[in-house]
């Protein structure tokens, strides 16, 4: 399971290690040839963080989010914590939160989560949180991997199976996220989030059938 998860979430971000190489690396400790240390650490860190989160039950917090991010990027990027400079997500064509307001927007997101965690279905709650996190883009690098790990944590914490965002469905995934961009940080209209929620629901079904059955 974890091999498929690590392969897909890192491949979405451009990691070129294929599934067989990922399996050999994580199961047998065999380092793939002609791959960068960054790509190798990327997979190893994902596996380590995933297993560490299975043992945790605490509520979302700035500390937990930063810890997940920093652990995912260990030996990859030395920049720790929320970013202090602006970024533009060119490939996705949207402007992230300006650096001076990252902490403020993350505060608002955590407050939104706390307010809605008892009145939204866990899949809907986790999906909307994931999107809003990605829209803020609070880190210099690793936002996608961190966001998908948080999505996984929120589902597992509520006794739901995790989701693979498959490499082959990357375009649909990113398109659904962009549709949801029309909602601001403290709101979540059904029209804006319907597609990404439906996408994640289908990915959950596919993950369950492909991995657990």
Each predicted region: which residue ranges?
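FIC/Doc superfamily catalytic core
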Residues: 1-213
């Amino acid at each position: 399971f974890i091999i498929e998860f690590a392969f897909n979430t890192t491949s979405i971000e451009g990691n070129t290690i294929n599934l067989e190489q990922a399996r050999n690396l994580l199961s047998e400790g065999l380092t793939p040839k002609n791959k960068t240390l960054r790509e190798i650490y990327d997979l190893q860190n994902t596996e380590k963080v995933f297993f560490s989160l299975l043992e945790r039950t605490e509520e979302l917090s700035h500390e937990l989010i930063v810890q997940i991010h920093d652990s995912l990027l260990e030996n990859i990027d030395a920049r720790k914590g929320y970013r202090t400079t602006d970024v533009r997500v060119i490939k996705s064509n949207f402007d992230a939160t300006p650096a001076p307001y990252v902490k403020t927007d993350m505060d608002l997101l955590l407050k939104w989560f706390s307010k809605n965690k008892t009145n939204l279905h866990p899949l809907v709650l986790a999906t909307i949180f994931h999107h809003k996190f990605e829209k803020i883009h609070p880190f210099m690098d690793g936002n996608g991997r961190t966001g998908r790990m948080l999505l996984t944590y929120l589902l597992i914490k509520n006794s739901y199976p995790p989701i693979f965002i498959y490499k082959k469905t990357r375009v649909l995934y990113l398109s659904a996220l962009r549709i949801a961009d029309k909602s601001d940080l403290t709101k979540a209209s059904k029209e804006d989030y319907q597609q990404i929620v439906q996408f994640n629901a289908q990915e959950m079904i596919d993950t369950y059938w492909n991995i657990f059955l």
